[in-house]
Each structure stands twice: as structure tokens, then as C-alpha cells.
């Protein structure tokens, strides 16, 4: 990183289920801590050691992640091709999801980068806030349940992630194949327009 950064503390994380290989369900990962104070490293190691370790299959998957095929191995070209395809598809889907949500009324979405999820924010209409209050649920929960009931699309309310009070988000994945994702986003758009019309 260059001499000007040689003393900066840096932590890097990698996960088998959240990396570009996307092997969801395998609970494996690592943390690399560079330039951390030795006392902090000891506490980090204690904390990590006190937790349950990954299953054998998760550890095996992690070994594959950190030891990909090398150029001298027969599977290398296929590995590179598949990796580039996966990363290219994720980039395309991230752009599609971000642009679609940002094109909707009363919705904004940060650029999806480095994750397989988007966290759009909804500028909730006052009538929707009132209805949610009557139902005794957070407005984002009401939105997500109505979305599920009317479209079959399952997203996670932002209130489950500790969002700032007075803001309303949801989390959705960008993992479905491109064609299914396009279809889902169109159904989402129709629902969102109807939701805004209902609670205008």
C-alpha cells in the first residue's frame, strides 16, 4: 500500500458465503489484522477462540477459496472463466438493481458494491406511517409484508438492521439470474406504485 500507509491498522474479512464464489450455507471465513497492537490481537484471538468454529465442510470450502487453482493446473482456465463470469454477472445485476430502485418514486438506493445485497430507502408517505402505527408495526415491516403478500417477493425490513429512527429501508438480494431479477424488479415496481397510490 506504500510507505505512507505502513503503520495503519487494517482489518480484512473474507467469507465463503459472501465472497465472489457465493457458496451460501458454508459457514467459513477469516479475518486478517495488520498492524494491530499486540494486546488488541490477543483480545481478538480470545474472542474468536471463544466462538464456535466452522463446520468441516465450511473449513474445506475456505481452503478452496484461499487456494484457488494456479496457472499450472488443468482447471485454471475454467476457474478464471467462471470467476470472471460470476463477477461480471454480479456487476451487471448490482447496476440493474441500483438503477431500478433509484428510478422509483420516493425510493433511493446507494450503489451496490462489494455485497450481494441492496438496501434501498423508502421515503414513506405520511398515510403509510399512520397505517403502520394503527397496525402496531414499523412502517418498513408493513411495506415488506404487503410486498410479500401481493407479489411473493421476500425482502427483509431495515428495522432488523438497526436503521436510524425515522428512516425506512429493506434489504434485498441481487443473486437471482438476470432474467429472473428483471422480472422481480418489474413486479416490485408495480407493487411500489400501487403502495404509493394506496397511501397517497
What are the residue ranges of the model-derived segments?
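PLP-dependent class I/II
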Residues: 1-200
Amino acid at each position: 500500500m506504500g510507505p505512507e500507509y505502513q503503520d495503519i491498522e487494517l482489518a480484512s474479512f473474507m467469507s465463503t458465503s459472501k465472497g465472489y464464489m457465493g457458496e451460501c450455507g458454508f459457514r467459513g471465513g477469516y479475518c486478517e489484522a495488520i498492524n494491530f497492537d499486540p494486546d488488541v490481537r490477543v483480545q481478538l484471538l480470545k474472542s474468536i477462540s471463544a466462538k464456535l468454529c466452522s463446520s468441516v465442510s465450511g473449513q474445506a470450502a475456505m481452503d478452496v477459496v484461499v487456494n484457488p487453482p494456479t496457472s499450472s493446473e488443468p482447471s485454471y482456465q475454467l476457474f478464471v472463466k467462471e470467476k470472471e463470469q460470476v463477477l461480471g454477472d454480479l456487476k451487471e445485476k448490482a447496476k440493474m438493481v441500483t438503477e431500478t430502485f433509484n428510478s422509483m418514486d420516493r425510493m433511493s438506493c446507494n450503489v451496490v458494491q462489494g455485497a450481494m445485497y441492496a438496501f434501498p430507502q423508502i421515503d414513506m408517505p405520511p398515510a403509510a406511517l399512520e397505517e403502520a402505527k394503527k397496525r402496531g408495526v414499523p412502517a418498513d415491516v408493513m411495506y415488506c409484508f404487503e410486498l410479500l403478500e401481493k407479489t411473493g417477493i421476500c425482502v427483509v425490513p431495515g428495522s432488523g438492521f438497526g436503521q436510524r429512527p425515522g428512516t425506512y429501508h429493506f434489504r434485498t438480494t441481487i443473486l437471482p439470474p438476470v432474467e429472473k431479477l428483471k422480472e422481480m424488479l418489474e413486479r416490485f415496481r408495480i407493487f411500489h406504485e400501487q403502495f404509493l397510490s394506496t397511501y397517497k
